[in-house]
C-alpha cells in the first residue's frame, strides 16, 4: 500500500497501554496522532521498576511479564519488527494453602510430592485423578452444546469433580491467571474457560507452549514506541470529557481547555471510556457498562514469607490461600521474579498481588494498583457486539477487554482499529490476525453515509 496516498487525519488516542500504544504506533505512519496518558508514564500494565539492590541495578516487571509465540502471534511479530530482544522463561505453578498445610508445585513428581504426606493422602490422589479426567474430557466438553450457557461452577458440579481438584488446583490456577477472586472464577462461563485453557496448552501435561519474557523488562518496547511518537505524547493529561460533533471530536481537559480532532480512539478500560463520553449512545451505555473491573494491589518486595513455606515448591506463579471456607478463602498470587526474568541478582525478588498480609516494611520496594476486567456472562456475550460501536461519531474503542484481557488481546484490538480507521495495514502477515477478538469488516458498514476507509484514503 502507498501510505503517502492516505490523506492524514488528526487523531487522538486516549490511553497508553498496549492497545493505545500499538494503535498510535501504526496510525502515526500516515496520520497526525496525539497520545494522551493520565499517568506520568506510558505503558499501562507494562510497568518496569528499576531499583538499587546492594549496589546493583535491578529492572523488574510488575504487570505484563510473559508471552508465548503460539498465543501471542501479533505481539511476537511486533517485537520482531522493532528488533526487541526476548528470551525463554519458566512458567511453573505452585499452591500453598493455610500457611503451608498443603503445598505442591507442578514441576514434576518432586514438586507434587514435596510434602511427603501427599504420597499417602487419598484426597491428594483424588485431586490428581480428577485433574487427569478434566484434561482427558476437555475436548468433548467443548463440543457439548448443552454447556454453552452454564458457569464453570455449574460445569464442575454437573461433571462430579471433587472439592480438592476444584479448590486446590483448578480455581487457584484460574484466579492466578485472571487476578480474580475464587468466587468470581466459579461464575466464569464454562466454555470460555475451557477454550482459553485449551488454546494456552493448560489442558495437557506435555508439549506446553514455551514462554518468553523481555530482558530488562517491558519498558524496552514502550521506549521504542515512545521514540517514534516523540513530541506527540501528553503525559499527566487528565481529560474531563469527550464531545462528539458532526464534523469531529472535541477533547476538554480538567481546566476547560479544548482541542479539536477528526477522530478519537478510546484505548482505555470500558468503564473509563464510558465515563469520558459526554453523551454516550444507548448502545455505548449498554455495552461499555457490561464490563466490570477488579482492582488489585501489587507489591514489589523481598519478603520471602509471601512464598510457599517449602522452598522446593517455589515456582514462577505461587497461589497462596487462607481460610476454612472454600468459596470465601483469602487468595493471592506471588510471582517469583528471578524465575520469570533474567535479573541481575540472586536475592529473591517477589511481586505479590493482593497478598494475605502486606510485606514487611523493611522489605518493601514499591506498590501499585492494577485494574483487571472481571468477565462474566454478559460481558463475554457483549464482546461479539463491540465492533458495532466502531467509527460512529468518529469514535473508536480498543483494549484488552475486547478479548481475554491479556496483551495479545490489547494489541489485536489496537492494530485492528488502526487498520480500519487509518487505512494502514500492519507490517506483517498472519493467517488470523484478529483470532482472539470479534472484528467485522467496516467496508460493509456505513458511518453517517461515509465509508471509514474511503475517508482515510481521501
Map each language-model feature to its residues:
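Extreme N-terminal leader/targeting segments of oxidoreductases
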Residues: 1-11, 29-30, 51-52, 380-384, ...
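Mid-domain catalytic core of redox enzymes
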Residues: 6, 238-371
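N-terminal Rossmann-like FAD-binding beta1-loop-alpha1 element of flavoenzymes
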Residues: 9-35
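Glycine-rich FAD pyrophosphate-binding loop
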Residues: 28-52
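N-terminal glycine-rich dinucleotide-binding loop that anchors FAD/FMN and/or NAD(P) in oxidoreductases
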Residues: 49-75
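Conserved flavin/dinucleotide-binding core of flavoenzymes
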Residues: 50, 107-108, 326-458
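Mobile amphipathic helical/loop "lid" adjacent to a hydrophobic cofactor/ligand pocket
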Residues: 69-187, 194-195
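Helical element adjacent to the flavin cofactor pocket in flavoenzyme catalytic cores
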Residues: 195-254, 259
Amino acid at each position: 500500500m502507498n501510505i503517502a496516498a492516505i490523506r492524514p487525519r488528526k487523531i487522538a488516542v486516549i490511553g497508553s497501554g498496549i492497545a493505545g500504544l500499538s494503535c498510535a504506533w501504526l496510525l502515526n505512519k500516515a496520520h497526525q496522532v496525539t497520545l494522551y496518558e493520565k499517568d506520568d508514564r506510558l505503558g499501562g500494565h507494562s510497568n518496569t521498576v528499576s531499583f538499587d539492590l546492594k549496589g546493583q541495578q535491578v529492572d523488574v516487571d510488575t504487570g505484563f511479564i510473559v508471552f508465548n509465540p503460539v498465543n501471542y502471534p501479533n505481539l511476537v511479530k511486533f517485537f520482531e519488527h522493532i528488533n526487541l530482544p526476548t528470551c525463554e522463561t519458566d512458567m511453573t505453578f505452585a499452591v500453598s494453602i493455610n500457611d503451608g498445610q498443603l503445598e505442591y508445585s507442578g514441576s514434576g513428581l518432586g514438586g507434587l510430592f514435596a510434602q511427603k504426606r501427599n504420597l499417602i493422602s487419598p484426597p491428594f490422589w483424588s485431586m490428581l485423578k480428577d485433574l487427569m479426567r478434566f484434561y482427558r474430557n476437555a475436548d468433548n466438553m467443548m463440543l457439548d452444546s448443552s454447556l454453552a450457557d452454564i458457569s464453570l461452577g455449574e460445569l464442575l458440579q454437573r461433571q462430579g469433580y471433587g472439592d480438592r481438584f476444584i479448590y486446590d488446583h483448578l480455581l487457584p490456577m484460574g484466579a492466578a491467571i485472571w487476578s480474580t477472586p475464587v468466587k468470581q472464577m466459579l461464575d466464569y462461563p464454562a466454555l470460555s474457560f475451557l477454550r482459553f485453557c485449551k488454546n494456552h496448552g493448560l489442558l495437557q501435561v506435555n508439549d506446553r507452549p514455551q514462554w518468553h519474557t523481555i530482558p530488562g523488562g517491558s519498558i524496552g518496547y514502550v521506549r521504542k514506541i515512545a521514540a517514534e511518537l516523540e513530541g506527540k505524547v501528553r503525559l499527566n493529561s487528565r481529560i474531563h470529557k469527550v464531545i462528539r460533533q458532526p464534523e469531529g471530536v472535541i477533547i476538554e481537559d480538567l481546566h476547560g481547555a479544548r482541542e479539536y480532532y477528526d477522530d478519537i480512539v478510546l484505548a482505555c478500560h470500558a468503564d473509563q471510556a464510558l465515563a469520558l463520553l459526554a453523551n454516550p449512545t444507548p448502545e455505548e451505555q449498554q455495552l461499555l457498562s457490561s464490563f466490570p473491573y477488579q482492582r488489585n494491589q501489587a507489591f514489589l518486595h523481598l519478603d520471602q514469607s509471601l512464598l510457599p513455606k517449602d522452598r522446593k515448591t517455589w515456582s514462577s506463579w505461587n497461589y497462596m490461600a487462607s481460610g476454612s471456607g472454600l468459596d470465601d478463602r483469602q487468595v493471592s498470587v506471588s510471582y517469583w521474579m528471578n524465575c520469570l526474568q533474567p535479573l541481575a541478582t540472586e536475592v529473591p525478588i517477589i511481586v505479590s498481588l493482593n497478598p494475605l498480609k502486606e510485606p514487611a516494611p523493611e522489605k518493601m520496594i514499591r506498590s501499585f494498583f492494577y485494574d483487571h476486567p472481571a468477565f462474566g456472562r454478559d460481558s463475554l456475550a457483549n464482546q461479539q457486539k463491540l465492533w458495532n460501536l466502531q467509527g460512529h461519531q468518529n469514535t473508536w474503542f480498543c483494549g484488552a477487554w475486547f478479548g481475554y484481557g491479556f496483551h495479545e488481546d490489547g494489541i489485536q484490538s489496537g492494530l485492528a482499529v488502526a487498520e480500519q480507521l487509518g487505512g494502514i495495514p500492519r507490517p506483517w502477515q498472519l493467517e488470523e490476525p484478529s483470532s482472539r477478538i470479534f472484528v467485522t469488516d467496516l467496508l460493509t458498514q456505513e458511518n453517517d453515509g461515509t465509508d471509514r476507509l474511503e475517508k482515510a484514503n481521501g
